[in-house]
Design a protein with these regions (language model features):
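Juxtamembrane helix-loop boundary signature in multi-pass membrane transporters
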Residues: 1-8, 99-160, 275-294
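Glycine-/small-residue-enriched transmembrane alpha-helix faces in small-molecule transporters
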Residues: 1-32, 144-171, 192
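Specific transmembrane alpha-helical segments of multi-pass solute transporters/efflux pumps
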Residues: 13, 17-18, 46-97, 133, ...
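Membrane-interface helix termini and inter-helical loops of multi-pass transporters
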Residues: 19-30, 86, 135-148, 198-212, ...
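Transmembrane alpha-helices of multi-pass small-molecule transport proteins
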Residues: 27-76, 103-104, 160-168, 183-202, ...
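Helix-helix packing/entry segments at the starts of transmembrane helices
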Residues: 34-36, 92-99, 168-191, 221-261
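C-terminal-most transmembrane helix of multi-pass membrane proteins
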Residues: 37-39, 137, 213-215, 249-294
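C-terminal transmembrane-helix exit sites in multi-pass transporters
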Residues: 44-53, 100-125, 253-273
Length: 294
């Protein structure tokens, strides 16, 4: 599968998840839904690996890296984003997540000594200006009585966790960790970390038997977790974390279109101006490092 197809498939697997997550909120605590999502995904992958008689034996050191990867990408990342969705319309956490491309570039510099160029810094600055414009009302009308600032902060924490997970996967890739078994163990460990968090909080393990909850959980577990991450991490293997992060740049556009259709989102002037600026900044960051996807 070539890079462009990997990019498109990943994009269309992930973009609807920002809206679908809304059906997970309500009766069941968001953290419990995260636990269910990745436990189900892990079980499905393990069944596949056992059926295919793939090797599932790894060293303690490898398991520790699986644990770190899973904690960052399949626990904390989603815990923060599920919680942010209780404060923000679904498209806005997706917009914040687009900054993952900037965090990935900086992470590559910090962890792998890849020094960012001047163009990288300019692109990152432009991207941040776009974010500020989009959320200008929330920024300039900051109030502790308004939950928006909490949602933004949680979305940024989720993005940072995702970027850190990308860096851990890049490290694991450099050490020849196999993709599918890595996903299986990382999702299992991530789900268990989330379960631990729920128990520390004293959260009750409830389940909602409505069609909307079960259908959204199935989509998020199978399409939004298994397939999306297989395609995304395969793309990361082929083109690097910086360019793979371009998925996070385009995703807000589709997420906003979905919110426009299903949540009656009105495109205000700050959104119309800020979103293209955000995309321009992120594209500048990517294009200066690696040639565009072909």
């Amino acid at each position: 599968m070539n890079n462009f197809i990997l990019f498109i498939v990943t994009l269309f697997c992930w973009s609807p998840t920002w809206y679908v997550i809304k059906f997970q909120l309500g009766y069941v605590d968001p953290l419990v839904s995260v636990f269910y999502r990745f436990l189900i995904a892990a079980i499905i992958i393990f069944v596949y690996l056992i059926y295919k008689k793939k090797n599932l034996m790894f060293s303690l050191n490898q398991h520790l890296w699986f644990l770190l990867f899973g904690t960052c990408l399949y626990s904390l990342n989603y815990v923060f984003f599920y919680l942010s969705n209780t404060y923000l319309i679904s498209a806005f956490p997706a917009v914040v997540f687009s900054t993952v491309v900037i965090m990935n570039i900086l992470g590559e510099h910090f962890y792998f000594k890849k020094k960012p160029s001047l163009k990288t810094l300019i692109g990152a600055t432009i991207g941040m200006i776009g974010i500020i414009i989009i959320f200008s009302d929330e920024i300039f009308n900051f109030s502790l009585a308004n939950g928006t600032h909490v949602g933004l902060f949680l979305a940024l924490l989720g993005t940072f966790s995702a970027s850190t997970g990308n860096m851990v996967y890049q490290r694991n890739l450099n050490n020849n960790f196999p993709l599918i078994p890595t996903l299986a163990y990382a999702m299992l460990y991530g789900s268990l970390v989330t379960l631990l968090i729920t128990q520390i909080k004293g959260t009750e393990l409830l389940f909602e038997y409505s069609l909307s909850y079960i259908a959204s959980l199935a989509y998020l577990s199978i399409v939004g977790s298994i397939f999306a991450f297989i395609f995304y991490l395969r793309l990361l293997e082929k083109v690097g974390a910086g360019r793979a992060g371009y998925v996070g740049v385009v995703m807000p556009v589709l997420a906003l279109l979905i919110s426009t259709v299903f949540e009656n989102l009105e495109w205000q002037q700050d959104l119309i101006i800020g979103l293209p600026i955000l995309i321009i900044g992120a594209v500048l960051v990517i294009n200066q490092k690696i040639k565009p996807i072909k």
